[in-house]
Amino acid sequence: MRQTVKEIVAIGIGGAIGTSFRFLLNTWTLTTGYPYGTLIENIVGSFLLGFLTSWFLVIVPKEWLKKGLGVGLCGGFTTMSTLAADSVLLYSHHPFSSLIYVAASLFGGIGFALLGYLLASKIATRRKREVAGS
């Protein structure tokens, strides 16, 4: 039970931080008329989640930290629902731009998740060897 409470608190704190960053990014990009904020959030969040996933396979942290950063921070920062809403709104005015936006979100998100995963794998494996060699 105590572990569950730690995880819930970590998810709440991570979610508050992630959501706050998402709000700030959307506020900063709002005047562009294009959903750059959501695109950036989802690509950066995908990179970060890919990085953390790989890192946590090599360097195993406490479960509450994994959940706080993954479910909380990344979950609060990224947003599928806003991606969907932005796509529909963009489609109503600029159908081709909507297609580009969805493709960039999908392929950019997956590509950057893979990039983060591969980068963390190299860094974490090197770090683990250095620590083991010390």
Swiss-Prot record:
Membrane-related topology note: Multi-pass membrane protein
GO CC terms: plasma membrane
This protein's UniProt keywords: Cell membrane, Ion channel, Ion transport, Membrane, Metal-binding, Sodium, Transmembrane, Transmembrane helix, Transport
Catalytic activity: fluoride(in) = fluoride(out)
Transmembrane segments: 8-28, 40-60, 69-89, 99-119
Subcellular location: Cell membrane
Gene Ontology terms, MF aspect: fluoride channel activity; metal ion binding
Family: Belongs to the fluoride channel Fluc/FEX (TC 1.A.43) family.
Its biological purpose: Fluoride-specific ion channel. Important for reducing fluoride concentration in the cell, thus reducing its toxicity.
Protein name, entry field: Fluoride-specific ion channel FluC 2
Biological source species: Halalkalibacterium halodurans (strain ATCC BAA-125 / DSM 18197 / FERM 7344 / JCM 9153 / C-125)
Lineage: Bacteria, Bacillati, Bacillota, Bacilli, Bacillales
